[in-house]
Structure formats: C-alpha cells, structure tokens
C-alpha cells in the first residue's frame, strides 16, 4: 500500500470528505505522522475512553469505586444499549458500565457514567484539568453523535485526543492500576472488527475504541505496535462524507494498513 499520507489523500478524494489523523509515539509523545491534526472532528463514541479515564481518576481519588452498583430504569435507556438493557433488574457496577461503554459502545452505560462525573460540562472540566484545552463534550448520548458540518460541539482534534490518551495511559494522572484497567477495556473492544483490526498482522498489539455517526462521520482511537507492544497512538477521524458506513470502514482500514506496512520509516 502507499505511504500513509498518500493513502490519506486518496481516502479524502474517495470519501469526498475530510480525514484527520495523527500517529504518535506512546513513550515520547513525538508526532510521526499528522494530517489535519489540529482541525476539529466529532468524537462520537471515542469519547467513552476519556469518560472512563475521568471515572478512574475519581476512583484513584477515593470518590468512586468500580464495585459500586448503579441502579437505573427503563426510561434511562437510550438507543443501542446491548448490555445495560439486560440489567434493568439487577443494575450494573461502575466497572461493568465502563466495560460495556468501551467494549460494546453501550450508550446508556455511557450516560450513567457521564452523570457520575458531572455530565458533559464535568467531563470537559476534567479535560481542562489534565491540560486539554481543545476537546469538549456538550451533549449526552445519543445527540453527541449529530456531527453537523461546522459544529464545534462534542469535538476534538486528532492532536488533542492523542495527547489526552497518552496522558491517561502513561502520565501520573492515573494510578498504574487504573492505566492498566483503561488499556484492558480497549484491548477487549468487541465492536471494532471492520477497522484496523481487519488488517492487523499476527503478533501485533491493538487496543481501540471506535465512533460512528449517521451524518458522515467515523472515527477510531487506537494503541498499536508489533511484537504485541503498545508502541504508538493512532487517531483517525472522518467527517462530512456521503460515503456508506462500509466504505468509511474500508478507508480507515486502508489507512491502518498503510501505517502498518510502512511502520519503520
């Protein structure tokens, strides 16, 4: 496949939309590849990783417990809640809700967790506190996936998202235990199959979270590397494309394939 930037340009023309991408070394934070890395893109469900980072920060501070049971009702459920809809009778723990939000992209689980951190404004305040002055959450699931052209609500930039992920996974902002827990939830992602996982060679590490919108957007945040090691952060967002979801998936997989093929560069 072509070099990553060539593949990205190709994807933009095939999608008639915009691609935003960054590839960052996890250890050093050095940027290896960037395309529209400072432009805004809808986060969609990729925000759920940051959300569970905020939850884990509360756990580390002693303000929350992963074992705490949350009870909820039918009227708390929103569209696409494959795990939480099964637990109306018994409720779910905070840890189970994070697992559902990240591994299955369960929207009601995300809303229940969002309430514990003070809603969209509370999550945005957490981002500011860890030094991300760009990423913003304004709405709840499922409205946050609206992805209107030119709308800054519920957006990030590839550069800001990558830096924030790096802070959550490697800095002292979360305990070592919480860092490992956040990464493990991403390793266990069950709904990212058609994206980078579809082009992953044997023996490569991946941990990821995807996002989708009915209105022309798609995204993935991932940790990736050969020798089963999380070597780099890769963030890819698409927006304003008329292409089908299958086509969006294919283009993201193509960009992933180009990155993997030209890893040593």
UniProtKB/Swiss-Prot annotation:
InterPro entries with a match to the protein in the record: Beta-lactam/transpept-like, Beta-lactam_cat, Beta-lactam_class-A, Beta-lactam_class-A_AS
Reactions catalysed, as given in the entry: a beta-lactam + H2O = a substituted beta-amino acid
Alphabetical keyword list: Antibiotic resistance, Disulfide bond, Hydrolase, Plasmid
Highest taxon of source: Bacteria
EC numbers on record: 3.5.2.6
Active site, renumbered: 45, 143
Disulfide bond annotation, renumbered to this chain: 52-98
Residues that bind substrate: 209-211
A molecular function (GO) term: beta-lactamase activity
Record Pfam families: Beta-lactamase2
A Gene Ontology BP annotation from the UniProt entry: response to antibiotic
Additional comment: The class A beta-lactamase family has a specific amino-acid numbering system, sometimes called Ambler or ABL numbering and often misspelt as Amber. A multiple sequence alignment was used to derive a consensus sequence and then the consensus was numbered taking into account insertions and deletions. This allows use of identical numbers, e.g. for active site residues, despite differences in protein length. UniProt always uses natural numbering of residues, hence there appear to be differences in numbering between this entry and some papers.
NCBIfam families recorded: bla_class_A, SHV_LEN_OKP
Family stated for the protein in its record: Belongs to the class-A beta-lactamase family.
Function (record text): SHV enzymes hydrolyze broad spectrum cephalosporins notably cefotaxime and ceftazidime. SHV-4 causes particularly high levels of resistance to aztreonam and ceftazidime.
Name used for this protein in its record: Beta-lactamase SHV-4
Protein species of origin: Klebsiella pneumoniae
Gene label: bla
């Amino acid at each position: 496949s072509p070099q990553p930037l060539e593949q990205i340009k190709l994807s933009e023309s095939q999608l008639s939309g915009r691609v935003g991408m960054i590839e960052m070394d996890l250890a050093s934070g050095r940027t290896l590849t960037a395309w529209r890395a400072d432009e805004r893109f809808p986060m969609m469900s990729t925000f759920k990783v940051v959300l569970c980072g905020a939850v884990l920060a509360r756990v580390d501070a002693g303000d929350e417990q992963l074992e705490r049971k949350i009870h909820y009702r039918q009227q708390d459920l929103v569209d696409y809640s494959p795990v939480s809809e099964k637990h109306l009778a018994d409720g779910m723990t905070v840890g189970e809700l994070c697992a559902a939000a990240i591994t299955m992209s369960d929207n009601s689980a995300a809303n229940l967790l969002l309430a514990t951190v003070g809603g969209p404004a509370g999550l945005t305040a957490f981002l500011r506190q860890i030094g991300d002055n760009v990423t913003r959450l304004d709405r709840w699931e499922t409205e946050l996936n609206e992805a209107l052209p030119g709308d800054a609500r519920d957006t990030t930039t590839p550069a800001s998202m990558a830096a924030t992920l790096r802070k959550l996974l490697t800095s002292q902002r979360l305990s070592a235990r919480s860092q490992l827990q956040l990464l493990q939830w991403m390793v266990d992602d069950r709904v990212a199959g058609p994206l980078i996982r579809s082009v992953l060679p044997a023996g490569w590490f991946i941990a990821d979270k995807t996002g989708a919108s009915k209105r022309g957007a798609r995204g993935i945040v991932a940790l990736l590397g050969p020798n089963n090691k999380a070597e780099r952060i890769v963030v890819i967002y698409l927006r304003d494309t008329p292409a089908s979801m299958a086509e969006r998936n294919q283009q993201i997989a193509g960009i992933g394939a180009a990155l993997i093929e030209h890893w040593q560069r």
